[in-house]
UniProtKB/Swiss-Prot annotation:
Binds 1 [2Fe-2S] cluster per subunit. This is Cytochrome b-c1 complex subunit Rieske-2, mitochondrial. Component of the ubiquinol-cytochrome c oxidoreductase, a multisubunit transmembrane complex that is part of the mitochondrial electron transport chain which drives oxidative phosphorylation. The lineage of its organism: Eukaryota, Viridiplantae, Streptophyta, Embryophyta, Tracheophyta. It catalyses: a quinol + 2 Fe(III)-[cytochrome c](out) = a quinone + 2 Fe(II)-[cytochrome c](out) + 2 H(+)(out). InterPro entries: Rieske_2Fe-2S, Rieske_2Fe-2S_sf, Rieske_Fe-S_prot, Rieske_Fe-S_prot_C, Rieske_TM, Ubiquinol_cyt_c_Rdtase_Fe-S-su. Disulfide bonds join C220-C236. It is found in: Mitochondrion inner membrane. Its cofactor is [2Fe-2S] cluster. One of its GO terms (cellular component) is mitochondrial inner membrane. It comes from Nicotiana tabacum.
C-alpha cells in the first residue's frame, strides 16, 4: 500500500504548478494536508501538490451541499440556496417586504361606513326595480285587459229590442226580453230540442239574454228578430234559433254560446 501511495504522489509531483491567487474564493487550509507525523511520512503533501489538487478540485466543485463543502474546498452557499437545500419549519419574514401599514384615521371611519351602507341601499333598490320590471312584463297589457272584458250600459236598451256589441273580436247579442218572450221560452218542451237546455240555465236575469252572435254551424252571424221562432236566423244555411238562443231548426248542432258576464249594477253589464 505504501508503495502504491508513493507512486501516485510522485506522479502528481510531475504536474505543472499553477499559482493560486490569494483572493480566490476557495482556500485550502494547511491542516487538511499536514499531519502530526514528520515530513518524511508518505501521508504528508507538499504545498505545490496542494495547489495542484485544489486546481483540479475546483473544476468539479459547485455551490451544492456536498462532501467537498464539508472539507472546506468550496465557499459557503448563498443564503437563498442554503434555505432551499436545507428546509426548516421556522418561518422568517422579510421585514422590508412585509411592513404593516399604519392604522387609519379614526375620524374617517364614519364616512367610510356611510358610503358602504349607502351603496348597499342603492344596489338593493336597483335589484328591486329589476325584479318589479320583470314581474310586470309578464302581466297582460292594457290593450289585452281592455279586450278581455267589456262594460255595457243597459239603460238605453228598450224592451223587445236587441243590441249588438263587440267583445274579443266577436259580436255579442244583448236582448231585453218582454214578459211574453220569457213565457214563450219557458213553455218549450225540452224533449223536442236538439241541444236540450232550460231557459233558466242560460240567463242570470229573465229580462236579459246575452249570447255570442256566431252560428254554431259554420260561424256565420245570425240576424236578430228573424226566423220561424222569433229569435235569430242564420242566412248562410238556414238555422233557426228561438228567443232563448236555442237551436230549433236547421243544420246548426248546438245552441248559441253564452259568454261569461255579470251585473255590476242594475243597468251595468260586464262581459268577460
Amino acid at each position: 500500500m505504501l508503495r502504491i501511495a508513493g507512486r501516485r504522489a510522485s506522479s502528481l509531483s510531475r504536474w505543472p504548478v499553477r499559482s493560486v491567487a490569494p483572493s480566490s474564493s476557495a482556500f485550502i487550509s494547511a491542516n487538511h494536508f499536514s499531519s502530526d507525523d514528520d515530513s518524511s511520512s508518505p501521508r504528508s503533501i507538499s504545498p505545490s501538490l496542494a495547489s495542484v489538487f485544489l486546481h483540479h478540485t475546483r473544476g468539479f466543485s459547485s455551490n451544492s451541499v456536498s462532501h467537498a463543502h464539508d472539507m472546506g474546498l468550496v465557499p459557503d452557499l448563498p443564503p437563498t440556496v442554503a434555505a432551499i437545500k436545507n428546509p426548516t419549519s421556522k418561518i422568517v419574514y422579510d421585514e422590508h417586504n412585509h411592513e404593516r401599514y399604519p392604522p387609519g384615521d379614526p375620524s374617517k371611519r364614519a364616512f367610510a361606513y356611510f358610503v358602504l351602507t349607502g351603496g348597499r341601499f342603492v344596489y338593493a333598490s336597483l335589484v328591486r326595480l329589476l325584479i318589479l320590471k320583470f314581474v310586470l312584463s309578464m302581466s297582460a297589457s292594457k290593450d289585452v285587459l281592455a279586450l278581455a272584458s267589456l262594460e255595457v250600459d243597459l239603460s238605453s236598451i228598450e224592451p223587445g229590442t236587441t243590441v249588438t256589441v263587440k267583445w274579443r273580436g266577436k259580436p255579442v247579442f244583448i236582448r231585453r226580453r218582454t214578459e211574453d218572450d220569457i213565457n214563450l221560452a219557458n213553455s218549450v218542451d225540452l224533449g223536442s230540442l236538439r241541444d236540450p237546455q232550460q231557459d233558466a240555465e242560460r240567463v242570470k236575469s229573465p229580462e236579459w239574454l246575452v249570447v255570442i252572435g256566431v252560428c254554431t254551424h259554420l260561424g256565420c252571424i245570425p240576424l236578430p228578430n228573424a226566423g220561424d221562432f222569433g229569435g235569430w236566423f242564420c242566412p248562410c244555411h238556414g238555422s233557426h234559433y228561438d228567443i232563448s238562443g236555442r237551436i230549433r231548426k236547421g243544420p246548426a248542432p248546438y245552441n248559441l254560446e253564452v259568454p261569461t258576464y255579470s251585473f255590476l249594477e242594475e243597468n251595468k253589464l260586464l262581459i268577460g
